[in-house]
Amino acid sequence: VGEDNAQMYYTLTYKNRPVIEESKLGVLIENQLFESALGVPNDTCHFWCENLKLTGTERRKADETWKPVYGERAEIRDCYNEMTLKFKKGEGDGAQEGGYDKRKNYFMNIIVRAYNEGVAFRYHFPETTNGLFLHIIGEQTSFTMPQGTMAYYERWAQGPYALRPLEGWGKEESERPLTLKLPDGLSVALLEAEMVDYARGKFRLSADKPSTLETSLYSSVDIISPYSTPWRVIMVGERPVDLIN
C-alpha cells in the first residue's frame, strides 16, 4: 500500500529476477446512483479502493488433480499456495463481514495463488445476507515490466503476431494471452481465466508510466455479491516452451 494509503501495489520476482515491477491493484466501482437510491452518503474517494482497511489474512495449500474434457494430458495437477487478503471499506453500522447493514460498509478480498509456474490473483466480493450491488467500470490492475521488454503484440484473436516494444501503441490494445520477452531472457505470459458474467479484458499501454500494461475492459459490469472477477494470471518460464509445458 502506498504511503498515502490510497493505492495498492504489488511486485513479482522469479529466482530473484524482476518480472513485474511496482504495479497497481484495484477495482474501479461507481455506486453513487445505487447508494443515493438507498439514502446512503456517496463515497467521496477518487478511486473506490482508496483507504481500504486490511482486516485479516487466510492461508492454505492445495495439491490436487483434475481431468480435462479433452487435451494432451489425462490429468492435470493443481498445486499452489494461496493467501486471501481481507479488506473493509467504510465505518459504522454493519461493520462485519456478511452484514452490510444500511450499506455503510463494503468488503472485498484479494485472493492470490502462487504456483511453480507463476502467480494468479482475483478480486472477490463475499456473500452477504441481503446481497450487494456493484457497478464495476474498470480495473486498476496493471503490469509494469522491466525496461526493454518486448511483446508479441496481437490486435485481435487469431490475428498475426508482431514483436513490438512496450511503446508507441497509441490507443491500440493487444489480445490476451499476451506473451512477453524480458531483457534478461525470461518469457512471461499475461492472461485471464474463469471469466464468468464479466467483460473481456485486453492490454493497453499506460499513458503515464513507461513499460506498463493496463487492463482494459470491453464494458462496465453489474454484479451482485457473492462474486469473483476473473483470475489475472502471470506465467513465467526460463524458455518460451516452458509456458506451454
What residues fall within each predicted segment?
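N-terminal accessory beta-strand-rich subdomains and adjacent acidic, glycine-rich linkers
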Residues: 1-245
